[in-house]
C-alpha cells in the first residue's frame, strides 16, 4: 500500500505498523487530499499529520493549530526527543524568538504548532505566505 519510505518514518515514532483506522486515513493524506478524521482519544490522530511531514520534501511545512498550549508543548517536546524539527509559536515568546522561529520554519519546514490567534499577526501571515505550507491541521 505504501512505498518503503514509510517504514523508517514509522520507526522514528517507535511504531512497527499502523492501526487499521490510521491506514484508512493515511492513504488519502499521503495523496494530498483533504481529510477529516474522527478517532477516539489516544487513537493515533497526531501520527496522521506527523508521519507525512517526515515524508515530505525538504522545506515543507505542516501547520498545527491548537488553542491548548499544554498539548502543543507536550507534542513539540516529544517530537524534538525523536529528532523531528518542531516548535510552537505563541504569545509567551519574546519578539526575537518569535521572529527566529518564523524564519527557521519558513525556510526549513517541519511541524509548527500555533494558537489560532497567531494568524492575527502580520509577521506570521507574511512568513507563512512565503513558506511552502504542505498541510494545515486543525
Range-by-range predicted roles:
Residues 1-40:
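Conserved pre-motif I regulatory segment
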Residues 29, 51-52, 56, 75:
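Hydrophobic residues on the short alpha-helix immediately C-terminal to a glycine-rich phosphate/catalytic loop
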Residues 32-52, 63-66:
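Walker A/P-loop
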Residues 54-58, 79-81, 103-107, 127-132:
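Conserved catalytic network of the ASCE P-loop NTPase/AAA+ motor domain
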Residues 97-112:
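Conserved motor-coupling elements within RecA-like helicase/translocase cores
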Amino acid at each position: 500500500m505504501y512505498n518503503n519510505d514509510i517504514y523508517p518514518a514509522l520507526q522514528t515514532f517507535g511504531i512497527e505498523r499502523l492501526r487499521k483506522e490510521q491506514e484508512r486515513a493515511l492513504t488519502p493524506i499521503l495523496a494530498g487530499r483533504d481529510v477529516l478524521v474522527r478517532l477516539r482519544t489516544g487513537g493515533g490522530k497526531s501520527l496522521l499529520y506527523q508521519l507525512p511531514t517526515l515524508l515530505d520534501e525538504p522545506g515543507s511545512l505542516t501547520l498545527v493549530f491548537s488553542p491548548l498550549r499544554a498539548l502543543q508543548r507536550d507534542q513539540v517536546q516529544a517530537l524534538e526527543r525523536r529528532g523531528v524539527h518542531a516548535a510552537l509559536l505563541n504569545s509567551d515568546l519574546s519578539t526575537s524568538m518569535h521572529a527566529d522561529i518564523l524564519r527557521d520554519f519558513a525556510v526549513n519546514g517541519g511541524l509548527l504548532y500555533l494558537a489560532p490567534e497567531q494568524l492575527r499577526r502580520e509577521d506570521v501571515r507574511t512568513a507563512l505566505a512565503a513558506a511552502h505550507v504542505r498541510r494545515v491541521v486543525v
